[in-house]
Amino acid sequence: RTTMCPTELLFEAGKPPAIELLPIETRSTNASVAEFKRFPEEWRVVALDTGSADAMHSALARVGEQKRVAQEHAAKLGFAIEADGKDGLRPDAEGLVEIPCWRHAVINFPHPLLEQGLVILDTPGLNAIGAEPELTLSQLPSAHAILFILAADTGVTQSDLAVWRDHVNGARTRQKGRIAVLNKIDGLWDGIRSEAEIDAEIARQV
């Protein structure tokens, strides 16, 4: 399932494989995620059984958990609400919106690359970048590499371009290690468009 909160994948020796989840309600405080990392009691811990694929799947699914809340509650937590859902959360027929259950997740997983110090930060998209200043002010600028993944079937939007320009590859950020990736490119071969039309669409987005 799609990641619903910023998720760090790393390996920390001396700690068992586990997922640490920071409740979304912590957004109502002035404390940053980095500050909450000093208070382990604020996090929910889910053990990872690396010997069982089913157990791993069940545990990792927790990262994508959502819940329905009142619009006022979502707004207090920093979520934008939009009737059309283009630039924010779209209310349902009952006037409620779906928000992620967790503000941040840290997955401690034993893997040779992670054991060498690699840390992967997966963000759920534009909403997280706007709602969590740490991503734009600290974590993204200091990253050695950023993969900016775009959906080829929907095209590059103005919001995508703004994030790329302002937070990923702008004049005030490092230029090396910034890579844009077109995902879902296989969906362009729909049996209707010609090869030339598909090539033109890819070239336009690139």
Would you name each region that the model predicts?
Residues 1-206:
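Globular "head" domains of long coiled-coil molecular machines
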